């Protein structure tokens, strides 16, 4: 009994010493602009951010003072896109006015509604969300091009805010406001950048497998305990007066994520009483969701910043891949080839693809797209 008591006191002493060491180290480095230190501090802080309401309270504004997207008028609006239809997935593509080539490439590949309807018996709707050309010299000509483009494809949603990086939160509010007003019956809503490849067949198959009344659903590449960037040289710079806390609430990368319709409604509701000056849209999305008690779920095949490895064993499970401009057509043909499924089918196929995926995703220093854990899923 005496030995046990001594061991207990020794363990307690070691824990106390370790805690003092960590606290002392953090105190010494607190003034350092060190990325690793900032991440350690912010990740330690994330429990408070995710569990309590002081962040939401500090960013809240009265509803009548909200400066959201409701104050901007629609210049182009396809309000009947979802009318009287049972929509499985409403897919918003965030785009810029000048990116017509990207939009055309998406329409022919992963955003092809007719292809998904005929091959997978699923009704998806793809719309492009954008603001207005920021260059006044080009604005009139560009706007006329957009009007003509929409006459042909009927898939643009545009409001009259300037289409800039610092207005991405307005583009987020445009999306969720449009869902709330014109497509509230869509079961799932996706937001994606226009340089993303979305494996819509895999995504649709996955969404169809979920329970009919799936709720509180939010999947993507989750960032946990991310610190605000305080360097003015970064385009992600956020000053203390805009966001004073050491960590953001958990959120999914804005490049691509999917939510259920109840989450879309909750985010829209929360956005009506939050200060929208925080221009990093995926962080603002996390703040809205946190206010409503919605937690993001990490999906290993939603990509990070880099491109997915080009291999059939990856295509079989991929959901998104980032950074695709000139290769969408090639990747679409490769990823949807009928031989992809047959290659990984059966016991030997599963073993083969498991080995290949481990070799592709578990290399030391490889952090571009999917985590090593994806190889084992």
UniProtKB/Swiss-Prot annotation:
Q: Which residues lie on this side of the membrane: Cytoplasmic?
A: 1-13
Question: What EC number(s) does this enzyme carry?
Answer: 2.4.1.206
Q: Which UniProt keywords apply?
A: Glycoprotein, Glycosyltransferase, Golgi apparatus, Membrane, Signal-anchor, Transferase, Transmembrane, Transmembrane helix
**Matching Pfam families:** Galactosyl_T
Localization terms from the record: Golgi apparatus membrane
Q: Does the keyword Membrane apply?
A: yes
Query: Which reactions fall under this protein's catalytic activity?
Result: a beta-D-Gal-(1->4)-beta-D-Glc-(1<->1)-Cer(d18:1(4E)) + UDP-N-acetyl-alpha-D-glucosamine = a beta-D-GlcNAc-(1->3)-beta-D-Gal-(1->4)-beta-D-Glc-(1<->1)-Cer(d18:1(4E)) + UDP + H(+); a neolactoside nLc4Cer(d18:1(4E)) + UDP-N-acetyl-alpha-D-glucosamine = a neolactoside IV(3)-beta-GlcNAc-nLc4Cer(d18:1(4E)) + UDP + H(+)
Q: Which InterPro entries match?
A: Glyco_trans_31
Give the stretches traversing the membrane.
Answer: 14-30
The organism's superkingdom is given as Eukaryota
The protein's job, in short, is: Beta-1,3-N-acetylglucosaminyltransferase that plays a key role in the synthesis of lacto- or neolacto-series carbohydrate chains on glycolipids.
- Provide the leader sequence positions: none
What residues bear carbohydrate chains?
Answer: 56, 167, 275
Q: What is this protein called?
A: Lactosylceramide 1,3-N-acetyl-beta-D-glucosaminyltransferase B
Q: Its family?
A: Belongs to the glycosyltransferase 31 family.
What does the entry give for GO biological process?
A: protein O-linked glycosylation
Q: How does it sit in the membrane?
A: Single-pass type II membrane protein
Gene Ontology cellular component list? Golgi membrane
GO molecular-function terms, A-Z = glycosyltransferase activity; lactosylceramide 1,3-N-acetyl-beta-D-glucosaminyltransferase activity
Q: Does the keyword Transmembrane apply?
A: yes
């Amino acid at each position: 009994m005496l030995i046990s008591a001594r061991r207990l006191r020794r363990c307690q002493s070691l824990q106390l010493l370790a805690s003092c060491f960590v606290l002392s180290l953090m105190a010494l480095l607190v003034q350092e602009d060190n990325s690793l230190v900032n991440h350690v501090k912010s990740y330690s802080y994330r429990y408070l951010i995710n569990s309590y309401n002081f962040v939401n309270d500090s960013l809240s504004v009265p509803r009548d003072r909200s400066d959201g997207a409701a104050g901007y008028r629609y210049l182009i609006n396809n309000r009947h896109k979802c009318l009287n239809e049972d929509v499985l997935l409403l897919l918003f593509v965030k785009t810029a006015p000048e990116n017509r080539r990207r939009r055309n490439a998406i329409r022919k590949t992963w955003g092809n509604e007719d292809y998904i309807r005929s091959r997978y018996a699923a009704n998806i709707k793809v719309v492009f969300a954008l603001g207005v050309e920021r260059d006044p010299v080009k604005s009139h000509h560009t706007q006329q091009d957009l009007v003509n483009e929409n006459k042909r494809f009927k898939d643009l949603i545009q409001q009259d805010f300037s289409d800039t990086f610092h207005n991405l939160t307005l583009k987020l509010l445009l999306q969720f406001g449009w869902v709330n007003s014109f497509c509230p019956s869509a079961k799932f809503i996706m937001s994606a950048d226009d340089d993303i490849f979305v494996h819509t067949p895999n995504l649709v198959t996955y969404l169809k497998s979920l329970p009919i009344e799936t709720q509180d659903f939010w999947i993507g590449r989750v960032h946990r305990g991310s610190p605000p960037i305080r360097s003015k040289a970064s385009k992600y710079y956020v000053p203390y007066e805009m966001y004073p806390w050491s960590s953001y609430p958990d959120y999914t990368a804005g490049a691509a994520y999917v939510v259920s319709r109840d989450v879309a409604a909750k985010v829209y509701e929360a956005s009506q009483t939050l200060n929208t000056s925080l221009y990093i849209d995926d962080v603002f999305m996390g703040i809205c969701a946190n206010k409503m008690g919605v937690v993001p779920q990490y999906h290993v095949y939603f990509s990070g910043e880099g491109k997915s490895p080009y291999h059939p064993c990856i295509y079989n499970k991929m959901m998104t891949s980032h950074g695709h401009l000139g290769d969408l057509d090639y990747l679409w043909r490769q990823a949807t080839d009928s031989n992809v499924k047959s290659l990984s089918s059966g016991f030997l196929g599963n073993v083969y693809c498991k080995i290949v995926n481990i070799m592709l995703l578990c290399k030391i220093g490889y952090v571009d797209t999917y985590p090593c854990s994806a190889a084992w899923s």
